[in-house]
């Protein structure tokens, strides 16, 4: 019974629609009615600005971290904490507090990794930042990073155990499932990337090249 209750708590934590609540409370805006209509970090940055975007990012990461830590906090043994992280991710993407329409699972998944292995989280964050610098697109970065991180759960335990000491089949299975889910949630972004109409950040190598071309014209 304790496991069921904590899984429900993890789902409810994940269901907190950070972007929606921040928008309504401080900006009198429902971000679902602006930009891409998504409740996650990227659309919050786009619609509400950098301070709000950073706040939502940290809140969404914290949801995954806190949920994954629940077994430790309540002395629950014999259960893999990743199950609680997955419950939070499901809450984030299908939030009961926002009509089951939520984000794209990236930030809360990162929070789950932070609780599971801080060193692997830092490694994964570096992958994300490098990919973002090279592409200037959050959507493409999220998908590429998900694939690379999934592969890393298999390779690193046998090559660089300092980052991820042991192979955990459940972590790999969850990573594969989340990667698939992230691709599904980004299907509209994939089409825009193909069409060359996907939004880019004013950050990174690609953004610099575009600015340089614009100046030369």
Curated annotation (Swiss-Prot):
GO cellular component terms, A-Z: plasma membrane
Subcellular location: Cell membrane
Pathway: Lipid metabolism; phospholipid metabolism
Highest taxon above the source species: Bacteria
UniProt keyword Membrane present: yes
GO process terms (BP): phospholipid biosynthetic process
InterPro entries per record: G3P_acylTferase_PlsY (IPR003811)
Keyword tags: Cell membrane, Lipid biosynthesis, Lipid metabolism, Membrane, Phospholipid biosynthesis, Phospholipid metabolism, Transferase, Transmembrane, Transmembrane helix
Enzymatic reactions: an acyl phosphate + sn-glycerol 3-phosphate = a 1-acyl-sn-glycero-3-phosphate + phosphate
Known role: Catalyzes the transfer of an acyl group from acyl-phosphate (acyl-PO(4)) to glycerol-3-phosphate (G3P) to form lysophosphatidic acid (LPA). This enzyme utilizes acyl-phosphate as fatty acyl donor, but not acyl-CoA or acyl-ACP.
Family: Belongs to the PlsY family.
Assembly and oligomerization: Probably interacts with PlsX.
The protein, known as: Glycerol-3-phosphate acyltransferase
Organism of this sequence: Enterococcus faecalis (strain ATCC 700802 / V583)
């Amino acid at each position: 019974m304790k496991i069921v209750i904590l899984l429900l708590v993890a789902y409810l934590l994940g269901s907190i629609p950070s972007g929606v609540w921040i928008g309504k409370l401080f900006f009198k805006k429902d971000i679902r009615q602006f930009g891409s209509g998504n409740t996650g970090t990227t659309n919050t940055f786009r619609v509400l600005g950098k301070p709000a975007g950073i706040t939502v990012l940290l809140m969404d990461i914290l949801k995954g971290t806190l949920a994954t830590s629940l077994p430790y906090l309540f002395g629950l043994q014999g259960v893999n904490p990743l199950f609680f992280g997955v419950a939070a991710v499901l809450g984030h993407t299908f939030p009961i507090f926002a009509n089951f329409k939520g984000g794209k699972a990236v930030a809360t998944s990162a929070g789950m990794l932070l609780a599971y292995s801080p060193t692997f989280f830092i490694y994964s964050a570096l992958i994300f930042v490098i990919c973002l610098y090279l592409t200037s697109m959050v959507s493409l970065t999220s998908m590429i990073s998900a694939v690379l991180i999934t592969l890393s759960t298999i390779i690193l335990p046998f090559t660089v155990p300092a980052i991820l000491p042991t192979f955990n089949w459940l972590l790999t299975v969850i990573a594969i499932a989340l990667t698939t889910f992230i691709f599904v949630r980004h299907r509209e972004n994939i089409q825009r990337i193909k069409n060359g109409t996907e939004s880019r950040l004013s950050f990174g190598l690609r953004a610099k090249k575009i600015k340089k071309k614009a100046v030369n014209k």
